[in-house]
C-alpha cells in the first residue's frame, strides 16, 4: 500500500516523468511502464494513482497549463497598464522553460492527439480561450471592441505559429526575435488608437 501523504508527491513525480518520457520519445507512443520506470516506481503504482495512461497524459497537459497560468498571473501582476500587460503575455509565451525539449515534444504531441481525443482537444481549447481572454482584457482598454477582437486573434495566431516554427527549428530568426515580432504587430495595429479607449475594469488571467 502507498504510504499516507505520499500520493501528491508520487503523482507529481509521475507527471514529471511522463513529460520527460514524451520528450525522449518525441511522441505519445509511450507506455505506463516507460513512465513508471522514469519515475522510479512500479507500473502497478502508476496505474493505482492514474488508472490509465490516458488519464496520466491528460494530467500532464493540465500541469503544463497550470504552470503557464501561474507564470502569466505573476507577469500580469508585475505589469502596469494595458500595453505593458500585452508585453507580459508575449514574454511568458516565449520564456525559456516553454522550449525545453520535453515541453516542446509534449505540446506538439498533444496537438496531434487532440485530433483523436475529445478531452485533449477540450484542454487545448481552454488554453486558446485563456490566451485570447488575456489579450482582450488589455486590448479592450486600448481600442474599440471589434478592433480588439481582431488584434487578439492575430496576436494569438502569431504566438502559436511562432512557437511551432521555433519548436521545429524552422524559423529563420532566433528565438529571441519572436517576442519582438509580436510586439511589432501590436505597435502597428495600435498606432491608429494613440489615446486608447476608456479604461474598463478587467482582471482576467490565465
From Swiss-Prot:
InterPro entries: BetI_C, DNA-bd_HTH_TetR-type_CS, Homeodomain-like_sf, HTH-type_TetR-like_transc_reg, HTH_TetR, Tet_transcr_reg_TetR-rel_C_sf, Tscrpt_rep_BetI. Transmembrane segments: none annotated. It comes from the Bacteria. Residues 31-50 bind DNA. Keywords: DNA-binding, Repressor, Transcription, Transcription regulation. One of its GO terms (biological process) is glycine betaine biosynthetic process from choline. Signal peptide: none annotated. One of its GO terms (molecular function) is transcription cis-regulatory region binding. Gene3D superfamilies: Tetracycline Repressor, domain 2 (1.10.357.10). SUPFAM superfamilies: Homeodomain-like, Tetracyclin repressor-like, C-terminal domain. Residues 8-68 form the HTH tetR-type domain. Repressor involved in the biosynthesis of the osmoprotectant glycine betaine. It represses transcription of the choline transporter BetT and the genes of BetAB involved in the synthesis of glycine betaine. This is HTH-type transcriptional regulator BetI.
